[in-house]
Regions:
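N-terminal ligand-binding/catalytic initiation module
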Residues: 2-247, 535, 541-556
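Glycine-rich phosphate/diphosphate-binding loop of Rossmann-like nucleotide-binding domains
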Residues: 246, 251-367
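Generic secondary-structure signature for well-ordered alpha-helical cores
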Residues: 44, 48-51, 114-117, 167-171, ...
Length: 558
């Protein structure tokens, strides 16, 4: 978020931009470059006349040419390479192309973590810890951040989604990698490895290093949303707990995965017409994602249905490679797993088997969620046993990529006679149910939820991202799913092609929730009491991939 009282720049009344860049420097700036769309006046003023072809193009003409070039790339790799190249040349054209062809390019966009690996953003390592503030300020020079995130490769991709889906100005985002070393022997022995070639830092030194970075964000970009990405299972929840009450932070691996799964479950319950707190849920896989999902759904039971927290936790049975998490496992259970999620030994008996099929037989779950990366773990026996005891089994094999899914949607439907409500962690084609019907498989993709949460937090200038804000976002997304009791074969989630509309709807409700909890900080206090005005205000803040008029100013932006 911006650090000025005026907030994010109003996109409905944009004045000409004053730039100090000229000539080749301007053409090399992916943020300000217009390529052949620079006007005659701008070419004269910025020393570009001899550097560009004669004809001045419109953005629409450039878009047509770029789309032709994209289509002429026959393989996915070449298409992705073209998009990568375009992004580092001309961001307005890049985002415009994706926006205009969102449905066609949806799969590629949703998998951006595999596309963009450019050396962009800020790299921070322990050996340069004393220079951390200097490096951070240099990276932020002349920029007011809305968004900062950790981990260059995937976080650069997440920033793209924030801009494309939620209208966050890409110039106001900063991808950051906190490079704390690696224990990967292949990387350590690679002479060309570019990271810090050192044993992975842990314990107090690690905590101090991350803490210093987080404090820099609070000090110098106090209204920036800090998006944590790809922090290991032992650190993710610990860091979220540490900073969640101090600043606006969001951990996508925990909260994003939890929120989109809660949204998908909310949609499924609209089909079954049952309450969240009435479910019996087996969570197969108790890593950061699985535990994040269990916590998110439990918290929703508490906040939405008014269930006692302890009773809500007892609606879950967590299973991992050691079997059901019960007290007898002792130190095989991670220390960050709450006591309420661990089953009592007396409930099972000393000789009871507690692996997945046995747990399914005893629990008779209504919901089965997989985050185990154990391919095929939801076997025919498991699914058929579940289907014996519930009319419409809710089955979410969320492990990705596709080859690691706990089961395929086709098998889930076959083993339940077409009654299952299925969502996956990777794209799957529709399943033929017979009788002329096809089941549309919802992809439980975080990209449908975190852009709207971030946008709502940024525009409301939220001091924190609260649990209720995230739960409300999940409810909104779930309510937008096409599936219903009358049409159970429809997708449980909106199509990614509708993600921009989804983000705005989520953001509005997140803003409302921020107001209800007293964490919003609008300059115009009238916005606190007028939802229609907030909608207009939100829409005025959305960055759009359009060219602005430039005026040369030696003291302008560089």
């Amino acid at each position: 978020m911006t650090t000025h009282n005026t907030g994010i720049e109003d996109q409905t009344s944009i004045k000409p931009l004053r730039l100090a860049l000229r000539g080749t420097d301007l053409l090399r700036s992916e943020i300000y470059n217009k390529g052949s769309a620079f006007t005659e006046r701008e070419r004269d003023e910025f020393g570009l006349r001899g550097r560009l072809p004669f004809t001045v193009n419109t953005l629409e003409q450039q878009l047509e040419r770029a789309y032709d070039q994209y289509q002429n790339r026959k393989s996915d790799i070449r298409k992705n390479s073209f998009l990568q190249s375009l992004k580092v040349q001309n961001q307005v054209l890049f985002y415009n192309l994706l926006t205009k062809h969102l449905e066609e390019m949806a799969d590629a966009i949703a998998e951006y973590s595999h596309l963009f690996r450019q050396p962009e953003g800020l790299y921070i390592s322990p050996p340069s810890v004393e220079k951390m503030e200097e490096d951070f300020l240099e990276a932020c020079a002349g920029r007011e951040l809305d968004l900062g995130s950790g981990g260059i490769g995937i976080s650069s991709a997440k920033a793209v989604i924030y801009s494309l889906v939620a209208g966050i100005d890409p110039a106001r985002t900063l991808a950051v990698v906190l490079d704390v070393g690696t224990n990967n022997p292949e990387l350590r022995n690679d002479e060309l490895y570019l990271g810090w070639n050192h044993d992975r830092v842990r314990g107090e030194e690690y905590d101090s290093f991350v803490d210093k970075f987080a404090k820099l964000v609070v000090t110098h970009q106090p209204q920036c949303l800090l998006h944590f990405e790809d922090f290991g299972v032992s650190n993710a929840q610990k860091l979220l707990d540490r900073y969640a009450t101090k600043q606006a932070v969001f951990n996508d691996d925990i909260q994003g995965t939890g929120a989109v799964t809660l949204a998908t479950l909310t949609s499924a319950l609209q089909v079954t017409q049952s309450k969240l707190s009435d479910q019996r849920i087996i969570q197969f896989g108790a890593g950061s994602a699985g535990l994040g999902i269990a916590r998110q759904i439990r918290d929703a039971m508490v906040l939405v249905d008014g269930t006692d927290p302890k009773v809500a936790a007892e609606k879950f049975w967590l299973v991992d490679k050691n079997g059901l998490l019960k007290k007898g496992l002792g130190d095989k259970i991670r220390s960050d797993i709450e006591e309420d999620f661990i089953r009592k030994e007396d409930d099972w008996g000393a000789n009871d088997e507690t692996h997945l099929l046995d747990v399914v037989k005893k629990v008779k779950p209504t919901v089965l969620i997989g985050t185990s990366t154990a391919k095929g773990a939801f076997t025919e026996d498991v699914i058929r046993e579940m289907a014996k005891h519930t009319e419409q089994p809710i089955i979410f094999p969320l492990s990705n990529p596709t080859r690691l899914a706990e089961c395929t949607p086709e098998d889930a439907q076959k083993w339940t006679n077409g009654k299952a409500l299925v969502s996956t962690g990777s794209p799957f084609p529709p399943v033929d149910l017979g009788n002329g019907k096809k089941y549309t498989v919802a992809e439980c993709n975080n990209a449908l939820v975190y852009p709207g949460i971030g946008l709502g937090a940024i525009v409301s200038r939220a001091k924190r991202v609260t649990d209720k804000m995230i739960i409300r976002a999940a409810q909104v997304l779930g309510e937008m799913g096409p599936a219903s009791a009358d049409k159970p074969e429809a997708s449980l989630l909106p199509d990614f092609a509708d993600s921009q509309k989804v983000a705005v709807a989520i953001a509005l409700e997140v803003m409302d929730q921020a107001i209800r909890e007293g964490v919003a900080d609008f300059d115009d206090k009238a916005l606190l009491h007028d939802k229609d005005a907030r909608k207009i205000y939100l829409e005025s803040k959305l960055w759009k991939p359009e060219y602005r008029e430039y005026v040369y100013d030696p003291d302008g932006r560089k």
